[in-house]
Each structure stands twice: as structure tokens, then as C-alpha cells.
């Protein structure tokens, strides 16, 4: 079987409010103001596809939020999204590979984050057979082509794949292609799934 796992809030806990809190502190802008003005719009998606530079992304977001931050300050906030690894999921990934299954990560991410998490959380790459990252592929979830690409590269049919993601839209997109989609709603979703199918951790 091919097991495809999203990264944020599946393998590692993330919280975007932490990003805005850092930017609020550094810019002197109230958190409530930033929360209202920030949106994951077109530039956000372009950044995840690797279609714009980190500097262009930072400048655009700062303009949209009407805040003045240096690139270093922007980056400090951007990296604050990460909380910690979910060790129970890392353990499952390792056990799946030991049992002969293929385990890959499929994440909507960006160059700024990729400059950070691989060094701070090396167990993610160490526990996966391959990392499929949106900015390397010029595609992002929930676009069907990104799922088709992973299946083709891995040599599995949709009915041989299980996909875990915390965003329902992504799960539905994978399911529409015939992949078994699991919506991760909390830390227990992944361990509970494998208990239900009889896979021992």
C-alpha cells in the first residue's frame, strides 16, 4: 500500500495564530487587526507553487496587512507556525515502512518553511520514503494533478493508496480520484485509523 500524509496538523502540529502573534509584537499592530487583514489568497498559493520569490511574498503580505517588517522579522514570524512533532505518527510511519509499505509526505509548503523545518524536525524526512512538496512541483492540493503525479511517480493505482490530511477539501479531491481519504481532525485520527484496520503500532 501507498500511504500519503500531509505534514501540518498530521505529522507536526502547527498554529497560524502564532505567526500573527509574532508579527503583531514586532510591528506594534494589534493582533485583531492582523487577523482581519491577513488572507491566504492568490499570492499565498503562488508562493506554495514556487511561482514567486520569498521576498515578493513577504513584501506583498506586509502591504496587504499594512505593516512594516524587515524580511528577517517576517521570516521569524513565518517560522513560528511550527509547534512540535506528533511522535505517535512518526512511529506509525516507521512501522509501516518496516512492514514493507510505501510512506510519502505530500505537503503544500513553501521555500521559507523548507529552509526551517527539515533542520529542526529531521525525523519527518527520516520517517518517509519521499517528500512531495508543492513548491518543488509547481502544483498544490487540492489540484487533482498533484495526486495523479504522486500516484504515477510511486507506481500505485488510486485504490492502493490512503491519504491523510487535515483540510477536508484536499481529502475530498483525493477521494474523487479513487484514493481512500482520511480527514484528520485531531491527534487521534491517524492512530485510531490504524487500530481500526488492525495495524499494530
Give a label for each model feature:
Residues 45-75:
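A metal-dependent, Asp-based hydrolase signature
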Residues 72-104, 144:
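Short, acidic loop-to-helix structural element flanking the phosphoryl-transfer center
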Residues 34, 43-47, 93:
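Generic hydrophobic alpha-helical segments
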Residues 1, 5, 110-111, 115-201:
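Asp-based, Mg2+/Mn2+-dependent phosphohydrolase catalytic module
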Residues 19-23, 58-61, 78, 113-117:
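Hydrophobic alpha-helical core bundles mediating ligand binding, dimerization, or RNAP-core interactions
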Residues 8, 13, 104-108, 165:
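Short beta-strand segments
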Residues 1-39, 67, 176-177, 192:
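Active-site neighborhood of HAD-like aspartate-dependent phosphohydrolases
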Residues 18, 22, 42, 56, ...:
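Alpha-helical elements of Rossmann-like donor-binding domains used by nucleotide-donor carbohydrate transfer enzymes
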Amino acid at each position: 500500500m501507498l500511504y500519503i500524509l500531509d505534514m501540518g496538523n498530521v505529522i507536526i502540529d502547527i498554529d497560524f495564530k502564532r505567526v500573527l502573534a509574532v508579527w503583531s509584537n514586532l510591528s506594534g499592530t494589534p493582533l485583531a487587526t492582523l487577523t482581519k487583514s491577513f488572507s491566504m489568497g492568490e499570492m499565498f498559493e503562488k508562493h506554495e507553487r514556487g511561482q514567486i520569490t520569498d521576498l515578493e511574498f513577504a513584501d506583498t503580505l506586509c502591504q496587504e496587512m499594512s505593516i512594516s517588517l524587515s524580511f528577517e522579522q517576517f521570516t521569524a514570524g513565518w517560522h513560528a507556525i511550527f509547534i512540535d512533532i506528533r511522535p505517535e505518527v512518526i512511529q506509525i510511519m516507521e512501522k509501516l515502512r518496516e512492514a514493507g509499505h510505501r510512506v510519502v509526505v505530500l505537503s503544500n509548503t513553501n521555500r521559507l518553511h523548507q529552509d526551517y523545518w527539515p533542520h529542526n524536525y529531521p525525523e519527518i524526512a527520516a520517517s518517509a520514503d519521499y517528500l512531495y512538496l508543492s513548491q518543488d512541483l509547481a502544483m498544490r492540493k487540492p489540484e487533482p494533478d498533484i495526486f495523479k503525479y504522486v500516484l504515477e511517480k510511486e507506481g500505485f493505482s488510486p485504490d492502493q493508496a490512503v491519504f491523510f490530511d487535515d483540510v477536508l477539501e484536499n481529502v475530498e479531491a483525493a477521494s474523487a480520484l479513487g484514493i481512500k481519504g482520511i480527514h484528520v481532525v485531531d491527534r487521534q485520527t491517524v492512530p485510531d485509523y490504524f487500530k481500526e484496520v488492525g495495524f499494530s503500532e
